Amino acid sequence: GNSLILGVPGLAKTLLVHSLAQVLNLKFNRIQFTPDLMPSDITGTDIIQDDAATGQRRMVFMPGPVFANIVLADEVNRTPPKTQAALLEAMQEHRVTIQGRTYQLPEPFFVFATQNPIELEGTYPLPEAQLDRFMFEIVMDYLTEEQEIEVVQATTAIQNFQFRHAVTGADIVAF
């Protein structure tokens, strides 16, 4: 289910979620939440496009990054409530409504949101309606000194991991 991951920067929260998407062979999109992010930056919007065949202009829907199986809402509390609300329908109903038209999101669909629990300056509290849509709250903490030494000894550089697909999106939906 949808999960809220709490942890300070540098704990590999993004890597964890991206790796999960790779193992499950699911489409992954990351959205960096900032104060100037707009709801349409998440859900998508209509744009004017020239039709080469007719020469006419028409409105065409351009899907936003929420159209993925696993969406990482990075630092979700850094954007105003109006923008945070763009995720509510997606998290609850696996669809988005734009300009009165409803678009289904791919299944399975999960939102993983990250939040820094220490740095509160320039943040907006998550409303209860949004917190209720998270099935899990995962707290990530610093490694112990021994664990850090083990990680450093095991890895000396950023590696390009090749994951074996454990299941497919269809397997998850069928379960």
Task: Annotate the PLM regions.
Residues 38-56:
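Conserved NTP-binding/hydrolysis module of P-loop NTPases
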Residues 5, 72-73:
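Hydrophobic anchor at the beta1->P-loop junction of P-loop NTPases
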